[in-house]
């Protein structure tokens, strides 16, 4: 009999908004309902949890009985669309208390939704959100740049990166330019 392993959370991947926006491939790892759902990021790694930092520029409360909040978080490369509702009451309360504009750090699950006309929308289901300062945002940009470049350096050598190439036709130079542009906006 195999010993029960302790529950381990998946690492939260750092990803820029412009890369997450291009994400289209989602899959379930396993057959049961508790199996995790992953996305393959265009830079070549699977993720079911992401860590983002940016400026909360907009927040909107929606619903009457099933209240939830939508928001926009902007990083140097684009916009993340975030949501928090009754499925994560602490995250919803955290988001409700933050007044834009504010630098925020968010851990959440990437969510893909295909519209009737075939467009794919990507949002982040918030697990936690906190106000941070500009220095934290700048450090996140540096860390995210490093992790993105590491994924691109390994591109084509892992199953996930080969799947990304198949699904997206990823051109690493495009993402290297995104990293360069993001770094140019950091104040060190």
Residue ranges of model-derived segments:
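OB/S1-fold single-stranded nucleic-acid-binding modules
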Residues: 1-42, 162-188
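Catalytic micro-motifs at enzyme active sites that drive phosphoryl/nucleotidyl and oxygen chemistry
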Residues: 40, 59-61, 92-95, 113
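Short nucleic-acid-contacting surface segments enriched for D/E, G, S/T with interspersed K/R
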Residues: 45, 88-107
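Structural detector for short beta-strands of small beta-barrel domains
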Residues: 47-65
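A general secondary-structure signal for short beta-strands and their flanking turns/coil
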Residues: 47-49, 66-68, 103, 119-121
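Short, surface-exposed secondary-structure boundary micro-motifs
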Residues: 55, 109-110
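OB-fold (S1/OB) nucleic-acid-binding surfaces
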Residues: 61-88, 132
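Extended, charge-rich, solvent-exposed interface segments
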Residues: 97-103, 109, 116-188
């Amino acid at each position: 009999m195999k010993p029960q392993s302790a529950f381990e959370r998946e690492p939260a991947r750092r990803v820029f908004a412009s890369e997450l926006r291009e994400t289209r491939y989602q899959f379930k790892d396993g057959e049961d309902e508790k199996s995790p759902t992953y996305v393959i990021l265009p830079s070549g790694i699977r993720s079911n949890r992401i860590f983002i930092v940016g400026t909360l520029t907009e927040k909107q409360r929606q619903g009457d009985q099933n209240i939830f909040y939508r928001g926009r978080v902007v990083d140097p490369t684009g916009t993340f669309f975030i949501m928090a509702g009754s499925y994560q009451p602490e995250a919803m309360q955290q988001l409700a208390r933050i007044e834009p504009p504010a630098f925020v750090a968010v851990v959440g699950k990437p969510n893909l939704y295909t519209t009737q006309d075939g467009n794919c929308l990507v949002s982040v289901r918030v697990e936690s959100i906190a106000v941070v300062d500009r220095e934290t945002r700048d450090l996140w940009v540096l860390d995210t740049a490093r992790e993105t470049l590491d994924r691109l350096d390994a591109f084509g050598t892992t199953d996930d990166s080969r799947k990304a190439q198949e699904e997206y036709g990823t051109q690493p130079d495009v993402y290297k330019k995104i990293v360069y542009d993001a770094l140019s906006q950091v104040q060190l």
